Design a protein with these regions (language model features):
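N-terminal structural segment of carbohydrate-active enzymes
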Residues: 1-131, 139-141, 146-150, 155-164, ...
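Hydrophobic faces of well-ordered beta-strands that scaffold small-molecule active sites
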Residues: 11-13, 60-62, 132-134, 261, ...
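The substrate-binding groove and active-site-proximal loops of carbohydrate-active enzymes
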Residues: 22, 26-42, 96-115, 217-242, ...
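Loop/helix patches that line or flank the sugar-binding groove of alpha-linked glycan CAZymes
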Residues: 23, 70, 85-88, 345, ...
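Active-site-proximal helices and loops of the catalytic beta/alpha 8
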Residues: 122, 140, 152-157, 168-181, ...
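Active-site region of glycoside hydrolase catalytic domains
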Residues: 127, 131, 142-229, 233-236, ...
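C-terminal beta-sandwich/jelly-roll accessory domains of carbohydrate-active enzymes
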Residues: 496-560
Length: 560
């Protein structure tokens, strides 16, 4: 049990902007923009934003907004065309940025006014009471990076580099000593030329990346020499040139009203830079949040210490809950995962889906979206830390389309032009939703709206009940939340069958709750059922827990 600070619990809704509003149902494999169409920023009108907010959401992460490498030709608008050898898919990866100061033309109705459309979307999002999350991709850029929209006073990345040096702290890139880029492991017939080759984004400091490398990107240089005689050395004095340029990019977008940055592969960038950059950004914009994609639990506290507000809890909580859903671990294993980050729990971002992970409903994961509901109840209601969901999750999107570069892998593509039917139905053609999709949406809405409606769930104390209930620990997970006199009991059931259990409230929890025997009325927050409870030390409560769901009972204790 631990105490938490009073605050609004963030519920982040990730949208892949290019896909979200697309209503072109052609869905041709490897289809072009003209064939398959593309969602636009204007698709997020007030009505759509209100529907998203009504799910219980507080933040929207607009993924893929910054201009990135693409095989689509916008040269008639003065936008440089990207070579297809170094583009993944037709639409391209949103994490191969080719201009940090530009908005992707695909998602604009008026390409020449694409920045104006983004500014208008920020304004609309704020108008309905939601906050804006935007990508920041600090580790790498597209191979043909060249900014055409940077402010006049800004020098471009690589513009002043000395490419004869493999490493210099004042270079923005790493170079392969005059060797040309060799894409023979990627392309049948390479026509793209890069001399000298730049190091590839996933720390490949040689000129021949493989097809499994991030070959379409180049690594940014933050003052670390990865290839010196000792293996690695830091060169942070004087301040590396890249630090200034990347911090200027953050300040540029923060000035436009971006409320939070989701920082891609944050742990591939040195903590020294993050301490320097977050300090400068938060000095100017103290409310701006930094979300870190960090996968090494031993580094969590280091990244929090240098200014990150929230970090992905993937290797711990996500992996655990996924295993519980799939029957590979007992539900009681969840206890260990929150305990592992007990001292930093406010900073851990829980999720069940995002663009990198397989959809719950896909056969690669659970094969049934309903199996994610007990995990949703547990992860969303346990603690005051942020929770994130991915557009389409609330409708049971399976991610099983074969779109092109992405293939059929249980994930929704980030490389191709496509229409995601579950999102199209849920937001623009609701008459086409199935009863199962409507039912799942209502469950998500009911659970997520409780998060900030109930004080005990938003900011209350947490009490894990599993140590006193080891007899139910295989497929059920139970805990209490408490704020003042309000107590909420949550029990989730990962089993596909309804179960009857005897739940023990241990003496320590009883003393924390009230300390004296008392009769109370408990009300279900999911279906409004009521039941009488007599609370006493080491009490046992008979409960019936529905299949693939849970119970959430609220009790208001009397004054002593």
């Amino acid at each position: 049990m631990f105490n938490v600070q009073s605050s609004m619990k963030p519920v982040i809704y990730q949208v892949f902007t290019r896909l979200f509003g697309n209503r072109n149902t052609t869905n041709k494999e490897w289809g072009t923009l003209a064939e398959n169409g593309c969602g636009k920023m204007d698709d997020f009108d007030i009505s759509t934003l209100k529907r998203i907010k009504d799910l219980g959401v507080t933040h929207i992460w607009y993924t893929g907004v910054i201009r990135h490498a693409s095989a689509t030709d916008y040269s008639k608008y003065g936008i440089p065309q990207q070579h297809p050898d170094v583009v993944k898919g037709i639409a391209g990866s949103p994490y191969a940025i080719c201009d940090y100061y530009d908005i992707d033309p695909d998602i604009a109705n008026d390409v020449n006014n694409r920045m104006g459309e983004w500014e208008a979307l920020i304004e609309r999002t704020h108008k309905v009471g939601l906050k804006v999350v935007m990508d920041f991709v600090p580790n790498h850029v597209a191979r043909e990076y060249h900014s055409i929209c940077k402010p006049d006073e800004v020098r471009d990345l690589g513009e002043d580099d000395n490419s004869e040096w493999h490493f210099s702290s004042q270079n923005n890139f790493y170079y392969c000593w005059g060797q040309p880029l060799d894409l023979s492991d990627v392309c049948v017939e390479q026509t793209y030329q890069e001399i000298p080759a730049k190091a590839t984004g996933n720390d490949r400091f040689f000129n021949r990346p493989s097809k499994n490398d991030w070959y379409e990107t180049v690594k940014l240089n933050y003052g670390i020499d990865y290839c010196d005689a000792g293996g690695r050395s830091d060169h942070f004095n004087p301040i590396p040139d890249t630090w200034n340029k990347m911090t200027s990019i953050l300040l540029f977008w923060a000035k436009k009203g971006v409320d939070a940055f989701r920082c891609d592969m944050a742990e591939m960038v040195p903590t020294a830079f993050w301490a320097w950059a977050t300090d400068k950004v938060k000095f100017m914009y103290p409310e701006v949040k930094f979300i870190g994609e960090v996968y090494n639990p031993s580094e969590y506290r280091n990244y929090i210490g240098v200014g990150f507000d929230w970090l992905y809890d993937k290797v711990g909580m996500y992996d655990c809950v996924r295993d519980v859903i799939c029957g590979k671990r007992p539900a009681a294993a969840i206890t260990y995962e929150w305990q592992a980050t007990d001292d930093i729990h406010d900073h851990m971002l829980y999720f069940l889906e995002n663009h990198d992970e397989q959809r719950i409903a896909s056969p690669f994961f659970a094969g049934d979206a309903r199996k994610g509901v007990p995990a949703l109840i547990a992860n969303a209601l346990m603690l005051p830390n942020p929770f994130m969901l991915y557009a389409g999750q609330e409708y049971g999107e399976r991610g099983m389309d074969k779109e092109g570069f992405s293939g059929r892998d249980g994930r929704t593509t980030i490389f191709d032009y496509w229409c995601v039917d579950s999102i199209r139905h849920g937001y623009y053609q609701r008459r086409k939703l199935t009863n199962e999709e409507k039912e799942l949406e209502q469950k998500y809405k009911k659970i997520l709206k409780l998060v900030n409606k109930e004080k005990a769930l938003r900011e209350g104390d947490f009490y894990d009940l599993m140590y006193a209930n080891q007899h139910i620990g295989n497929q059920q997970y139970a805990f209490l939340r408490k704020a003042g006199k309000e107590v909420i009991l949550v029990v989730t059931n990962f089993s596909p069958r309804m179960v009857s259990i005897e739940l023990t409230i241990p003496r320590h929890a009883f003393e924390h709750l009230h300390g004296e025997p008392v009769e109370v009325i408990s009300v279900s927050l999911l279906n409004k059922d009521k039941r009488k409870l007599f609370i006493y030390p080491d009490m046992t409560i008979p409960l019936i827990i529905p299949a693939l769901s849970g119970i959430v009972y609220k009790t208001v204790l009397p004054q002593k």
